[in-house]
From Swiss-Prot:
It comes from the Eukaryota. Keywords: Chromosomal rearrangement, Cytoplasm, Endoplasmic reticulum, Microsome, Nucleus, Proto-oncogene. Homodimer. Interacts with AKT1, AKT2 and AKT3 (via PH domain). Interacts with PNPT1; the interaction has no effect on PNPT1 exonuclease activity. InterPro entries: TCL1_MTCP1 (IPR004832), TCL1_MTCP1_sf (IPR036672). This is T-cell leukemia/lymphoma protein 1A. It is found in: Cytoplasm; Nucleus; Microsome; Endoplasmic reticulum. The gene is TCL1A. Restricted in the T-cell lineage to immature thymocytes and activated peripheral lymphocytes. Preferentially expressed early in T- and B-lymphocyte differentiation.
Length: 114
């Protein structure tokens, strides 16, 4: 996965919150759906996820128990320093948030525990 695509425009209006609506669908505060397209694991320590904003027909919301175990958290919340804090209290770095030909992608990377 490239560190930052060279084509496209940077997006600065990041979602304040992303929470799991159903399996493989996250919803932001504006009711936009984000789908985790790629999950990358390196050396068991580095986890990255590429999220794409898509128009999808939403099913019924699911509880964490219904969603089941996942490498990804149930929720992310944007902090003032530009990082996301997840429901398990870990921090994720926003590597990039871009729009190419109307398609919006966001790459998040799990930060190591301090």
């Amino acid at each position: 996965m490239a560190e930052c695509p060279t084509l496209g425009e940077a997006v600065t209006d990041h979602p304040d919150r992303l929470w799991a609506w159903e399996k493989f669908v996250y919803l932001d505060e504006k009711q936009h759906a984000w789908l985790p397209l790629t999950i990358e694991i390196k050396d068991r320590l580095q986890l990255r996820v590429l999220l794409r904003r898509e128009d999808v027909v939403l099913g019924r919301p699911m509880t964490p128990t219904q969603i089941g175990p996942s490498l990804l958290p149930i929720m992310w919340q944007l902090y003032p320093d530009g990082r996301y804090r997840s429901s398990d209290s870990s921090f994720w770095r926003l590597v990039y948030h871009i729009k190419i030909d109307g398609v919006e992608d966001m790459l998040l990377e799990l930060l190591p525990d301090d």
